[in-house]
Design a protein with these regions (language model features):
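A short, conserved alpha-helix in the catalytic core of glycosyltransferases
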Residues: 171-176, 180-184, 191-225
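Short, flexible, basic/aromatic active-site loop/helix in glycosyltransferases
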Residues: 129, 145-166
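Glycine-rich, basic loop-to-helix element that forms the pyrophosphate-binding segment
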Residues: 76-93
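Non-catalytic, C-terminal membrane-associated alpha-helical segments of glycosyltransferases
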Residues: 243-247, 257-319
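Conserved donor NDP-sugar-binding/catalytic core segment of glycosyltransferases
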Residues: 110-143
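Short aromatic/hydrophobic "clamp" motif used to bind/position activated sugar donors
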Residues: 98
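Short, acidic, metal-binding catalytic loop of nucleotide-sugar glycosyltransferases
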Residues: 37-46
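N-proximal low-complexity "stem/linker" segments adjacent to membrane-targeting elements
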Residues: 1-38
Length: 319
């Protein structure tokens, strides 16, 4: 990847964007620079790019000597982890809308214009983009179920169509009105990834809180805002699949404790009662994929039960 170059001749835009890219490891340096350059090529005059380094001094020093001055490069000033890094970016942002792009995701051509457009409608408080899996091997493993794209942070079968309302976006490509995000105090540090810990659900809680705080406003899926999300070979294994499912269940238990089961599991009820059974039927000619569906559901459920038990134990100890 060549050095990131400055971008000139920017057009004036209607809705200003603050694009936040959070990174934490030098192992993704090439991907981080590609994500930044692709974003830089798309910004308009009133937009800004904020790169947040999550408690990694070596990476911070490297990027300081690499990135052009027009990019705001800052260190996570909150608790270590993705939620703290995102909150650092939000605190620094000045745009009307904060766009979040993962450090291993590359926005498609025109993605930022597509991220901007829905916010001309004042009823839209947030959007989720399309997250296309870019498998290092060229394609998903034969056993991998389409219904479990969320395991690798990508789109999955069962998502609403473009323009329809969603509970929450996928974190690799999402955008939120800055004032609304500040109003709900950003992302909870009780949830979300810390380094390689496979936790999640911080975007789910954000969506739940936005719906509660801004009734009558909408979070919609807008597939024109598309990114290609890199999936390394080590995430194309059954071991990663089961660990991620289990940690998702644990995270859902924390979410249920914070927001209540009704809000925490509203989308999952339809997913488990309708999408997974139909997925098993679609995959009936591929026994390995059917087995992966069952295993994925089992590990997620086990994580949830474990998380609820730990929450109950903690509540009892605190009483």
């Amino acid at each position: 990847v060549p050095p990131v170059s400055a971008h000139d001749g920017l057009a004036v835009s209607a809705v200003s964007l603050s694009v936040v890219i959070c990174c934490y490891t030098t192992a993704r340096r090439t991907q981080v620079l590609r994500a930044i350059q692709t974003t830089l090529d798309q910004i308009a005059a009133r937009d800004e790019i904020i790169v947040v380094v999550d408690h990694n001094d070596d990476l911070l020093a490297d990027l300081q000597s690499t990135l052009p001055e027009q990019i705001a490069l800052i260190a996570n000033r909150f608790e270590r982890g993705l939620s703290g890094a995102r909150n650092t970016g939000v605190a620094r942002s000045r745009g009307e809308v904060v766009v979040f792009v993962d450090d291993d995701a590359v926005p498609a051509s025109g993605a930022l214009d597509h991220a901007r457009a829905p916010f001309e409608d004042r009823s839209v408080v947030a959007i989720g983009g399309a997250v296309r899996a870019d498998w290092a091997s060229g394609s998903a493993p034969g056993w991998f179920p389409d219904e479990f794209g969320w395991v690798v942070g990508c789109d999955y079968r069962g998502l609403p169509a473009c323009g329809e309302q969603i509970r929450n976006p996928i974190g690799a490509a999402m955008a939120v009105r800055r004032t609304a995000l500040v109003e709900i105090e950003g992302f909870s540090t009780e949830l979300g990834r810390v380094g390689d810990l496979l936790a999640g659900c911080e975007e789910t809680l954000m969506g739940v809180q936005l719906h509660a705080r801004f009734p009558g406003h909408r979070i919609i899926r807008h597939t024109g805002f598309q990114v290609d999300h890199h999936i390394p070979a080590e995430r194309a294994t059954l071991g990663y699949f089961t660990r991620r499912c289990y940690q998702e269940g644990r995270s859902k238990a924390v979410l249920a404790r914070i927001s209540g089961r009704q809000a925490a599991l509203s989308s999952e009820r339809s997913y488990t009662s309708r999408i997974l059974p139909s997925g098993a039927w679609r995959a009936r000619a591929n026994p390995r994929r059917v087995l992966a569906l069952v295993i994925g559901f089992g590990y997620t459920a086990a994580g949830y039960v474990t998380g609820m038990a730990l929450s109950a134990r903690s509540a009892k100890a605190a009483a």
